[in-house]
Amino acid sequence: MQGEDSFQIPAGTEGDSFPLMEINTGEPHTSFLQTEASEQWDYVLVADHRTQRNTRQAQQQQQFLEELKRKGFHYKMIEDHEKVFFGIRADSRVFDLYRTLLMEPEGPAARVQPTRPTPVPATTRIRIVNFVLNSKTAAGDTLEDLVKRGIFETRFALHKGEEDLKKKWAQWRNMVHTQPIDDIRDYFGEKVALYFAWLGWYTYMLVPAAVAGLIIFLSGFSLFNASQISKEICEAHDILLCPRGDHSRRYQQLSDTCTFAKLTHLFDNEGTVLFAIFMALWATVFLEIWKRQRARVVLHWDLYGWDEDQEEMALELINCPEYELRPYQHSYLRSTVILILSLLMICLMIGIAHLLVVYRVLAAAYFNSALLFREEQVTTAVVVTGALVHYVAILIMTKINKFVALKLCDFEKPRTFSERESKFTVKFFTLQFFAHFSSLVYIAFILGRINGHPGNSVRLAGLWKLEECHLSGCMMDLFLQMAIIMGLKQTLSNCAEYLGPWLSHKCRLMRSKLSPASRDPELRDLQRNYLLNPVNTFSLFDEFMEMMIQYGFTTIFVAAFPLAPLLALFSNLVEIRLDAIKMVRLQRRLVPRKAKDIGTWLQVLETIGVLAVIANGMVIAFTSEFIPRVVYKYHYGPCRQGARPAVDCLTGYINHSLSVFYTKDFQDPVQIEGSENVTECRYRDYRSAQDYSLSEQFWVLLAIRLVFLILFEHVALCIKLIAAWFVPDVPQSVKNKVLEEKYQALREKMRYGRLRPGWGGARPRPDPQQCHSCL
């Protein structure tokens, strides 16, 4: 097993420098270390003076503290006029036991010079003390239970020695500077450091994706006026469109949709297919190279062979020497119940998406009847307000989903904290995924496909006509929905994420100024930490979840929103410093967690990558007009059968893609404005003009769409698999370093064995040439 922290790491190893992160090759900063001789507290418990006057609560406090004392902890009560602070510090015997159980000193420095006393890193001290404090007492209570009952008000680890991080990292002016990952690790632990290392690498890799998306978007401008389809739409003054919904009671000239059609072609063009394949490859390369970066980082930290189960068992034994191992268990009954309950929650998410559909239908009718918008603006107003309603629904469902996921985890009874965290991650992300993407699925694949035809429209509750896509397709609706939701999440969430803790901290500081200041520096330090915003086990989890949802928006449906990587890039540059400022300046110190990877989040990223291939393939096949344009170009248009006419190959596409409806077949009793001299109108579909049944061309297109989807997904997935195979997860330098360490360990054991009594005396040293000849 590898050591806890590395104090002397050789310089010059391959990959010591990473984009947006900085790996130190020297010893950790001394301000991050605490020796046993120091009088700094590892942890602080806070109680209100009123609990001291309550005999029963004071007795429970004393019982808890005395039990800590029996486990080898020291405590000291420090009072001010309102609060009582209990400083907690572990005895050196606790850390000696920790080293003994893991059979390793604290880092390579201790192994090279075992006689030199090595300081215990503050991250290790806090982690061990936090584990013991939050374990069950002899009475069956946890510290969380005591806090809920008001026996203690709160608990936290102290900020000490964070000045360097404030200067080098937690400032807005450092936005484009590299991150001091080693310093972050020495102060916040490996879990937080890996989060920022991953976030920095993700942000760096967004640069090529953002550039490619911007190129695709700008290339659409070349088609803004030059597109044959746009020209036909803008010049079609003699083609009348059938009313598209209850909000429209008049015939509209096709040329009136000119601007909307041009905007649609910014996103729905031939470059979309190439960009979708590029993003599938990008997602794979991003993950594969991150695995290599992670391997270098954890080897640098001497955690390559660290075992999480062994660590947790060691902490359990430190807390209770009589601890009995909890074996792995699996209950099919519990799993079945959890699966059923999860499916019910997913059905609820889908139900909310249906409610959003109802809202869009009713909003269209209301906006038209109330004359709030002009008729041509109603559709845009419905899309925008629908996206806003969906965003509010996401905020509400996030709280509900977290509560449900926690209850499901409690019911499942995981064996350890890490197992509980992993199961909670899967459940919560699944629910959040459906909450965020259900409406996008509706717009991309359902909107406008179940409406019937003008003479026999499908109606909600028999009253309101379902909304339809624009003549140019649903890509613009999908783009607007994604842009609004992602834009709101990135801007409003970042503002709330910073302003909320900042305002809360300022309010706490203002209230504290009403009380007399203490002259005791120790008490002032405790008060300063107490006035910071509280943290919990979800503090880092929420940051990861936010980035996973953003990654989903950046890859899933990116064919409809090529600017998503660019928006994510700018957002992440702000997010890194925002999180740094929040953790160092505005919040209490996070409890350090040891880790050698980002855990279940890696599987989440891989799942999103596969879903992105499927979703983008379906968007190109069924949502965009790419397939109908290609089929017309080579099967129905002027260029069919290899002809090379003087006109554009898409000439006549608009007239070909619109079906004819005779106005005499309208069943709607409401009089349509200007219908006296109109005998026919056109609508977006492939139907027969005689009986309005689906035409042969519809089925041909459907077959080609399905074939394209299968080919696209297979090609994209093959590219992903080849890229994953071509780029090894672990660099050769890391493999060789690990191999060398194993070899040196065996040589050391061999040397030690030769010195032991009973070895059998000196043996002849084999000829090196003979050793090599045996290979």
Regions from the language model: what does each represent?
Residues 2-775:
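Intrinsically disordered cytosolic tails
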